[in-house]
Amino acid sequence: MGLPKGPEGQGLPEVETREDEEQNVKLTEILELLVAAGYFRARIKGLSPFDKVVGGMTWCITTCSFDVDVDLLFQENSTIGQKIALSEKIVSVLPRMKCPHQLEPHQIQGMDFIHIFPVVQWLVKRAIETKEEMGDYIRSYSISQFQKTYSLPEDDDFIKRKDKAIQTVVDLSDAYKPRRKYRRQQGAEELLDEESRVHSTLLEYGRRHGFSRQSKTEKAEDKKTALAAGLSAAEKTDAHEEDELQAAEEQRIQSLMTKMTAMANEESRLTASSVGQIVGLCSAEIKQIVSEYEGKQSELSAEESPEKLGTSQLHQRKVISLNKQILQKTKHLEELQANHTSLQAKYSDKKKTLTELKNHGEKLDQEQAALEKLEAKADPSILQNLRALVAMNESLKSQEQEFKAHCREEMARLQQEIEILKAERAPGEKTISSGEPQGALTSTMTHNEDLDRRYNMEKEKLYKIRLLQARRNREIAILHRKIDEVPSRAELIQYQKRFIELYRQISAVHKETKQFFTLYNTLDDKKVYLEKEISLLNSIHENFSQAMASPAARDQFLRQMEQIVEGIKQSRMKMEKKKQENKMRRDQLNDQYLELLEKQRLYFKTVKEFKEEGRKNELLLSKIKAKAS
C-alpha cells in the first residue's frame, strides 16, 4: 500500500506492510476481539481498517481509565501526518499502562497487524478486567444505596424476630444462671487453705466437689468382684485406704455444710404443696409459655439448619425463585419486543428507501436505454444538427456583437450628421428670412427623411435578428438540457457504487433483523413450552392425590398421562420433521451458493482475461499507428 509517486518518478517514503493472508487473518482476529469486548463500531463496513483498529485501541485505553489526547469520533480518512500523530499519542500511553508488548507508531500507521495483535489482545483483556471491577464496585454501591432506603421481606422478618430471640436467650440465661443456695454463718471460723475456700464456695451454690459417695450395695458388689477376681493383699490395702480418704472427704464436706445456713429469700426451695398450688393456678399460662418456647426453638432451629426445612418451605422457595425467573424473562422479552419494534421501523424505512432508489434506478435505466436507442438510430444526423446549431449560435453571437458595434458606430455617425445638419439649418433659416431661394431647405428635409427611413429599417432588421437569435438560443438550451439529463459514465459508476453500498447496508440490516426474528420466535416457543410444562406439572400436582384415592381414578389418571406423553411424542416428531426439512433446505441453498460462487469466480476470471486482451489490443493498435506514421 504505497503512496503515489511524484512527477519526477521518485516515490515518497512508503510504509512497508505485508498484505498477505496472515495480515488479513490477524485483522479479522483483532476486529473479533474488539467486537467481543464491546466496541461495536468495528462492525461498520464503511470505515477503514485504520479507523477501526485505532478507534478500538483508544476505546480500550479510555475504558481502562487512562487519558488519550485524540478525537476519533467523526474524523475519518485522515492524512498521513494525522495518522502518525494519533499513533504516537496511543503509543505514548502504553508504557504508562505497563503494557508488556512493544509497539511503534509506524507499525500502527502501516497496519502491521501481526505486531498490533498482541497489544490489542492485552488491551482487550485489561479493558474486560476493568469493566468487571467497575461492575463489582457499582453493584456493591447500588446494594448499599438500596439498603439505605429499602429492605427485603427476609430482612424485615429477621429484624422482627431478632429482638424476640435476644429476649429469649436472655430469659434462658437468667433462668439457668447459677443461684446461691447456702451462706456461711456469721462468726464461723475463717478458712485458711485455698482448697477449703473453693469447696465452701461451690457448696454455697449447691455443687459438691470431691469423692462421690458409693452406696453400700455398690461396695458389696465391688468386694464380691474383687474376691472373685482374686485380688492380692496389696490391692485390698489400696481399696481400704481409698475408702478411708473418701470417708474423710465426706466428713469434711459435712463439717462445712454445718457452718452454712439456707437462703431465706425467693431463691429458696419450694415445697411440693406450694408447687402443686402454683401449677394448678397457672396451668394456662404455663401451656402458653411452653408453646411460645417451642415456636422459638423451631424458629431458631430453622435459622441454624436451613437444610432441614420441610417440603412445603422448599416448594415455596422454589416457587419464589421460579417467579423471579419468570419476571426476568418477561422483562427480557419486553426489551426484545421494543428492540424488535425499533428494528422493524428501521427496516421499513430502509425498505422504502430501497424501493424508491430501485424505482429511480429503473427509471434512469429506461431513460438511458431510450437515449441509447435514439443515439443508435439517429446519432449522426442529430449530432451534425447539434454541431450546426452550436456553430450557428456562436456565429450569431459574434454577428450580434459586430452588429451592435456597427450600430453604435452608425448611431454616432448619424448623431454627428444631425448635429452638422442642425448647425447648417440655423444659417439656412436666416437665408430664408433674408429672401434666399428654398432649394437648400428642400434638399435638407429630403436627406433627413431618408436618414429616418434607413434608421427605422435597420432597427426593424436588428429586432428580427434578435428574435431569431433568441429562438436559436432557446433550441440550443433545450438540447443542452436533454444532453445534461443523460448521466455520464462517471456518474453511472458513482450511482452503481452507491447502490451497491446501500444494498450491502440493507442486506446487513435485513440479516440482523432476521436473526432477531429467529431469536424472538425461538424464545417465544421456549416460553410457550415452559408455560405448558408448568401448567402440566401444576395439574399433575393438584390431581395426584385425588387420582391415587381410588383405582378407577388412578387408571383414568394414568390414561391421561399416556395421552399427554403420546401428544408430546407427536409434537417432538413434528419438530424433528421440520428440523430435517430445514436442514435439507439449508443444504440446497448451500449448494446454490457454491454454484453462484463458482459463477462469480468464472466471471471475474473472464473479466480479467478480457481486460488483458483489451490491453494487448491497445498495444497492437499503438504499434500499428506508430508504424503507419
UniProtKB/Swiss-Prot annotation:
Main location: other
GO cellular component: early endosome
Modified residues (Phosphoserine): 298, 301, 305
Amino acid composition bias (Basic and acidic residues), ranges on this chain: 215-225
Keyword Transmembrane helix: no
Keywords: Coiled coil, Endosome, Phosphoprotein, Protein transport, Transport
Coiled-coil stretches noted in the UniProt entry, renumbered to this chain: 231-430, 558-599
Region (Disordered) location: 1-23, 209-246
Sequence segments annotated as region (Sufficient for interaction with CCDC22): 1-428
Annotated compartments: Early endosome
GO biological process, one term: Golgi to plasma membrane transport
Chain segments carrying region Sufficient for interaction with WASHC2C: 446-629
Signal peptide per UniProt: none
Physiological role: Component of the commander complex that is essential for endosomal recycling of transmembrane cargos; the commander complex is composed of composed of the CCC subcomplex and the retriever subcomplex. Component of the CCC complex, which is involved in the regulation of endosomal recycling of surface proteins, including integrins, signaling receptor and channels. The CCC complex associates with SNX17, retriever and WASH complexes to prevent lysosomal degradation and promote cell surface recycling of numerous cargos such as integrins ITGA5:ITGB1.
Family: Belongs to the CCDC93 family.
Subunit structure of this chain's protein: Component of the commander complex consisting of the CCC subcomplex and the retriever subcomplex. Component of the CCC (COMMD/CCDC22/CCDC93) subcomplex consisting of COMMD1, COMMD2, COMMD3, COMMD4, COMMD5, COMMD6, COMMD7, COMMD8, COMMD9, COMMD10, CCDC22 and CCDC93. Forms a coiled-coil heterodimer with CCDC22; this heterodimer interacts with the guanine nucleotide exchange factor DENND10; the interaction is direct. Interacts with WASHC1. Interacts directly with WASHC2C. Interacts with SNX17 and SNX31.
Name of the protein: Coiled-coil domain-containing protein 93
Recorded name of the encoding gene: Ccdc93
